[in-house]
């Protein structure tokens, strides 16, 4: 038996959540209407060649809907397809979900965390869209709630990154 209480040689994410939260945890994607510096003209326009959010965004994720409504529809959506979850992680997935002023992030993340059954948040973003102030805020949330930050690092080679941009 390994230190994480399993006979597997790896500590699975789902196993970690079951041990931490006492049951199945489901990620619920939301679209908060964020953009990206490679889409809005700050760095580039049109986005990167690999970034096709339509390919993975569930139909209920519409930025015009409130975060709460998207969570409710996401719970219903996943409830029809999978075993019932005991807790939820709200997944800010589309584009760069820290690419906004801190007050906007506080409002959006706060709405998600206030929803019943939400154990935490998962935030997809770019390393260049996170500063010390935002990290301090996420650390503040993480004192009481689960927080994961997914940094989209498509390559560590600058030449390759230049090829990824659709306007390069």
Feature names for model-found ranges:
Residues 51, 159-163:
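Residues that scaffold the ATP/ADP-binding catalytic core of kinase and kinase-like folds
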Residues 42, 62-63, 102-103, 162-163:
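Short, solvent-exposed loop/turn segments at secondary-structure boundaries
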């Amino acid at each position: 038996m390994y230190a994480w209480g399993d006979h597997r040689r790896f500590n699975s994410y789902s196993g970690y959540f079951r041990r931490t939260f006492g049951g199945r945890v489901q990620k619920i994607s939301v679209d908060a209407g964020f953009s990206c510096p490679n889409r809005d003209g700050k760095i580039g326009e049109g986005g990167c060649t690999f970034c096709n959010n339509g390919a993975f965004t569930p139909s209920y994720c519409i930025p015009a809907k409130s975060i709460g409504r998207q969570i409710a529809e996401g719970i219903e959506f996943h409830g029809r397809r999978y075993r019932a979850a005991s807790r939820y992680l709200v997944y800010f997935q589309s584009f760069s979900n820290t690419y906004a002023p801190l007050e906007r992030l506080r409002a959006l993340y706060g709405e998600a965390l206030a929803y019943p059954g939400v154990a935490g948040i998962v935030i997809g973003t770019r390393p260049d869209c996170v500063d010390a102030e935002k990290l301090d805020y996420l650390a503040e949330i993480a004192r009481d709630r689960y927080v994961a930050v997914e940094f989209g690092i498509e390559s560590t080679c600058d030449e390759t990154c230049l090829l990824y941009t659709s306007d390069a």
